[in-house]
Regions:
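Alpha-helical membrane-spanning segments of integral membrane proteins, especially the hydrophobic core
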Residues: 69-82, 114-139
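Short, small/hydrophobic-residue-rich motifs at membrane-helix boundaries and re-entrant hairpins
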Residues: 2-105
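Sec-exported extracytoplasmic/periplasmic mature domains
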Residues: 19-20, 121-122, 138, 142, ...
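Residue-level recognition of alpha-helix termini/interfacial anchor residues
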Residues: 21, 66, 124-125, 192
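Selective recognition of hydrophobic, aromatic-rich stretches within alpha-helical transmembrane segments
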Residues: 72-107, 140-176, 207-240
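Nonpolar helix-loop interface/hinge motif
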Residues: 1-47, 110-114, 149-223, 242-248
Length: 248
């Protein structure tokens, strides 16, 4: 019951932070939202087309070396373009999160759409890219084996605050590298991994709604969930700070 009340309070704080000038705050996540909708619908369309194909329509005699090479080159080029787009969207998403942190803390009342591109202007996009790449590789490698999945979940929850930690370190000038960010995130999440997992689980109906509507519900759920997780982070670091102060 205590966790439920705390989660409810954090979500109310998130709503309060979004309530005024919601349109401008929504615009910060428009690119990630539209990309999510496009990706979702492309996946559904691809699965549909695959199901429509049958073995009877495949003729191995029509496959030539030139055709096979063309297909492979097309797949390679498509993969590279997709990777570049994913990196750009990832950086823009983190740029939007940086702005949401400022909004939640009352440091930015009227956000502008161009603010999400700040990481590309100040060069922090490279830090974001490397941070996310290393995290994805390490967690991805652990999920290769069944026995590694629990460790991947443990690390994933421990590193879940990395974007917010990165923002604070960049703002305070204490950034020393990605490992400093990941270690700080793990430190902040010590004793709170299970609690944060339950917090994320409390949004499951919103995730289902987004899936049912083919992503259209994300125009509300994305700002709401993003601001709620920032509220959780702020509450987490405030609690840790108060505990440290009371220890002296």
């Amino acid at each position: 019951m205590e966790d439920t009340m705390k989660f409810k309070d954090l979500k109310e704080r998130a709503k309060d932070a979004l309530r005024e000038n919601f349109g401008a705050k929504l615009r910060l996540f428009l690119i990630p939202i539209f990309w999510g909708i496009i990706s979702t619908n492309m996946t559904y369309q691809s699965n549909y087309n695959s199901n429509m194909d049958t073995v009877n329509n495949f003729d191995a005699n029509t496959i030539t070396t030139g055709l096979l090479l063309s297909i492979l080159i097309g797949i390679l080029i498509g993969g590279l373009i997709g990777l570049m787009i994913s990196v750009i969207i990832d950086v823009i998403t983190v740029g939007a999160r940086f702005n949401y942190i400022k909004i939640y803390r009352g440091e930015r009342e009227n956000p502008r759409f161009k603010n999400i591109f700040t990481p590309f202007k100040d060069g922090s996009w490279t830090k974001i890219f490397v941070l996310h790449l290393v995290t994805a590789l390490l967690i991805g490698l652990l999920t290769v084996t069944i026995i590694g999945i629990p460790f991947a979940i443990y690390l994933g929850l421990g590193w879940s605050q990395k974007d917010y930690i990165l923002f604070d370190q960049l703002e305070s000038g204490t950034y020393t590298g990605i490992w400093g960010v990941l270690n700080a995130s793990a430190q902040v999440m010590r004793g709170s991994r299970g609690d944060y997992f339950l917090f994320l689980l409390s949004f499951i109906l919103w995730y289902i709604l987004s899936g049912i509507t083919l992503g259209l519900a994300k125009f509300w759920t994305t700002p709401y969930i993003e601001m709620s997780t920032i509220a959780y982070y702020q509450n987490l670091i405030d609690t840790k700070r108060n505990m440290n102060q009371s220890a002296y």
